[in-house]
Design a protein with these regions (language model features):
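N-terminal interaction/assembly modules
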Residues: 2-139, 144-155
Length: 155
């Protein structure tokens, strides 16, 4: 899983979009590990290790921190939104990758500056993370849930 991020960095992340994509990948990996390990690990320590390991030279490390820590701070609210948007999927039954990609996507959709991260960018980036780290149907699932939430908050 980490190798993909490391390869992304090695091929050269020269623009803000690529840097943000790498930051999202690092945030997702950190949230995944915290979700998997629970109280055995500290999210901030995991995040700092992942930034060092997968993002050496990454200019905007604050974006990865903002995402991971923002998701953690708002996780209960975000999880309730997921449960409303996908009632047939209790949060604990959603694949751990998909669950954390949804959390990042919803955090960006709901809590981020819309000028900095337009909703369509937040949704597309979440779909890309799902395709990179998730299963065969992850992209469609993420798209469906985030699309549902986007329609609800747009009305």
């Amino acid at each position: 899983m980490g190798l993909i991020c490391h390869l992304d960095f090695d091929i050269g992340i020269s623009n803000n979009m690529g840097s943000r994509h790498l930051s999202r990948s690092i945030a997702m990996q950190s949230l995944y590990e915290k979700d998997f390990m629970g109280d055995k690990v500290d999210l901030e320590e995991v995040l700092e290790r992942n930034i060092r390991e997968f993002g050496p030279g990454l200019e905007d490390t604050d974006f990865a921190r903002k995402l991971a820590l923002g998701v953690a701070e708002n996780m209960d609210k975000i999880d309730k939104i997921i449960e409303k948007a996908a009632p047939e999927w209790p949060i604990e039954q959603i694949n751990i990758v998909d669950r954390n990609v949804l959390r990042i996507g919803l955090y960006e959709l709901i809590y981020s500056n819309k000028e900095e991260v337009p909703p369509k960018v937040a949704i597309n980036e979440a779909i890309e993370l799902a395709k990179m780290f998730g299963g065969e149907s992850s992209g469609k699932f993420i798209n469906g849930v985030l699309g549902t939430v986007f329609k609800q908050i747009s009305n």
